[in-house]
Swiss-Prot record:
UniProt-recorded name of the protein: Photosystem II reaction center protein L
Matches recorded under Pfam families: PsbL
Location, primary (coarse class): plastid
Subunit structure, interactors included: PSII is composed of 1 copy each of membrane proteins PsbA, PsbB, PsbC, PsbD, PsbE, PsbF, PsbH, PsbI, PsbJ, PsbK, PsbL, PsbM, PsbT, PsbX, PsbY, PsbZ, Psb30/Ycf12, at least 3 peripheral proteins of the oxygen-evolving complex and a large number of cofactors. It forms dimeric complexes.
Keyword Transmembrane helix: yes
Organism per entry: Nicotiana tabacum (Common tobacco)
UniProt KW keywords: Chloroplast, Membrane, Photosynthesis, Photosystem II, Plastid, Reaction center, Thylakoid, Transmembrane, Transmembrane helix
InterPro entries given in the database record: PSII_PsbL, PSII_PsbL_sf
Compartments, as annotated in UniProt: Plastid, Chloroplast thylakoid membrane
Length: 38
Protein backbone atom coordinates (compact mmCIF):
# COMPACT_ATOMS: atom_id res chain seq x y z
CA UNK A 1 0.00 0.00 0.00
CA UNK A 2 2.90 2.35 -0.74
CA UNK A 3 1.44 3.47 -4.05
CA UNK A 4 0.72 7.01 -2.81
CA UNK A 5 4.41 7.93 -2.46
CA UNK A 6 5.39 7.57 -6.18
CA UNK A 7 2.23 9.46 -7.15
CA UNK A 8 3.11 12.34 -4.84
CA UNK A 9 6.69 12.37 -6.15
CA UNK A 10 5.41 12.47 -9.73
CA UNK A 11 3.13 15.40 -8.90
CA UNK A 12 6.02 17.27 -7.28
CA UNK A 13 8.29 16.50 -10.26
CA UNK A 14 5.67 17.76 -12.72
CA UNK A 15 5.15 20.90 -10.64
CA UNK A 16 8.89 21.68 -10.44
CA UNK A 17 9.35 20.96 -14.16
CA UNK A 18 6.44 23.30 -14.92
CA UNK A 19 8.00 26.08 -12.82
CA UNK A 20 11.40 25.53 -14.51
CA UNK A 21 9.71 25.69 -17.93
CA UNK A 22 7.95 28.96 -17.07
CA UNK A 23 11.22 30.39 -15.70
CA UNK A 24 13.08 29.34 -18.87
CA UNK A 25 10.41 30.94 -21.08
CA UNK A 26 10.56 34.14 -18.98
CA UNK A 27 14.37 34.32 -19.27
CA UNK A 28 14.23 33.69 -23.03
CA UNK A 29 11.56 36.39 -23.41
CA UNK A 30 13.75 38.90 -21.52
CA UNK A 31 16.82 38.01 -23.60
CA UNK A 32 14.90 38.28 -26.88
CA UNK A 33 13.34 41.61 -25.84
CA UNK A 34 16.77 43.01 -24.95
CA UNK A 35 18.23 41.71 -28.23
CA UNK A 36 15.44 43.24 -30.35
CA UNK A 37 15.36 46.56 -28.46
CA UNK A 38 19.12 46.92 -28.85
Amino acid sequence: MTQSNPNEQNVELNRTSLYWGLLLIFVLAVLFSNYFFN
